Amino acid sequence: MAVMCDVDSTEKCEFPALYNFGDSNSDTGGRHAAMTEFPPQNGETFFGHPSGRFSDGRVIIDFIAEDLKLRYLSAYLDSIGTSFRQGANFAFGGSTIRPPGYSPFHIAIQISQFVQFKLLV
């Protein structure tokens, strides 16, 4: 889920924070933090070190954050030493919209994590 500004709009678009839910298309390290390390190149080419992403560079939410002039989102599950001032990423590679099955972090779990997150910040 993402809200974007109309590129033809004359209104200024400002977001103090960005929150993302999804799967591998926008996972910035959630699955990596919860499960196991990925073999290289998980983001090394763009970031210069392994980043836990499902690509060798940025994922779609990184481009959205750049466009909104926000920092790249940290994975909610990779929270040690992380600042969530400009948002958090609840996406998890392999997630589904259906209840338990292939992924333990289906969309209902991501929403539950967001509710917990709101109570803490």
Residue spans for each PLM region:
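Conserved active-site regions of diverse hydrolases
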Residues: 1-121
